[in-house]
Amino acid sequence: VDFTNRMIDVFGDQQASLVPALGDFFDGFRDLALDASSRVRRDQLLSSASTVTARFRELADRLSAFDLESKEALETKVEQFNELLAQLSLVNAKLIKVQDLSKQPPDLLDLKDNLLRDLSSYAKLVVKEESNGSVVVGLGSFDRKLLEKAEFGRLDIKTSSDRGSSIQLELSY
């Protein structure tokens, strides 16, 4: 949402807007067509062409900066998610050692619940609690298990440039 609002601000900014610059540019062509020999009108057209070029460059620079910033933010979020998942796998490993839920340490169960809550702020999770209090965690559905027993998957970011800049999340074990 933050990136979207900032993009709207950039494209809505009158100083960076292409609309007036393109209008001046095409008006310059119209004016030059009326008097093709006018040196002043040629210079005005060249000036408006320079303005349009500068606006395109400025917008391209801003979009590149947004692209980089959004990728870095995504990388940070994925790393935080992976760290929480690793912590939950350690908790799960301890919970698996005790078969009876009533004999599990309450602070360990609380830690598990807190980690699940934190993880769910990053992605839609499906959680199945076992009889001993350990959990099986899926991403969106159980066909993509993130955590089972003490085994967990790690999310990785894969980028490709075959169609511009494409980002995919991959789950690996």
Regions found by a protein language model. Name each.
Residues 1, 87-90, 96-173:
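Phosphate-proximal small/polar/acidic motifs at interfaces that engage nucleotide phosphates
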